[in-house]
Amino acid sequence: SGADLFLNALRGEWGEAAEINWVSRRNNFNALDEAAFADEYFTPEYISGFSGLKEDIRHQLLDEQKMTSDGITADSLLTIYRELYHRFEVLRKPRNIRLLPSRSVTTLESSGPGWKLLMEHHLDRGRESLESDVVIFATGYRSALPQILPSLMPLITMHDKNTFKVRDDFTLEWSGPKENNIFAVNASMQTHGIAEPQLSLMAWRSARILNRVLGRDLFDLSMPPALIQWRSGSRKKPQPEAAALTHYTTNIQE
């Protein structure tokens, strides 16, 4: 991640830097959301409720939940903070490190042996520039269609230029033969939720696809009623036998 790269540069893993600038489009260097109930976004029950929502609501939720997958781990943030504190407050070294949130790099120009970066501040619309010998991009991945699909594209229904329309069972909507299907994973975050690019539900996704391919439930995907009722009308109560599994007694010995 960008945080790991910054920490490596700060520690001189590639040699001591005269100056380090960490530019981020986010308004702060936010922590990964690892709250207990945030983990519930990565469950089949949540996906079931998410997929039936209106498109604008789904986009809103994805924005709200972004830090559950894209945030910086608490350990990394604390390590960076301690490194900076020790360097500048304890050792009193020159402040040659800058953290620059709320900025986008709009232009990258060759400047002698290095580079000149032009930046725009999102909040006050100010414009800045800086020069650097080395520029490291930590901007993630760009969505792209597989190169094997061009001949099939006229038959595939698209949501937009780079997004397929994916059904609940991970089949693509298309006008090809009904007995044939194209399955897609990591291609439907807009309809299947923030967990779709993650490995946490790989076993469940794979089982659902195999059940669909086989035309029978080889894998039992039934689940007890969820503790969190994500949608209105979810009135199922926890089953007594399921509750009994969590009953326990405590013995205290002194």
Indicate where each model-derived feature is located.
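Flavin (primarily FAD) cofactor-binding/catalytic cores of flavoenzymes
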Residues: 1-254
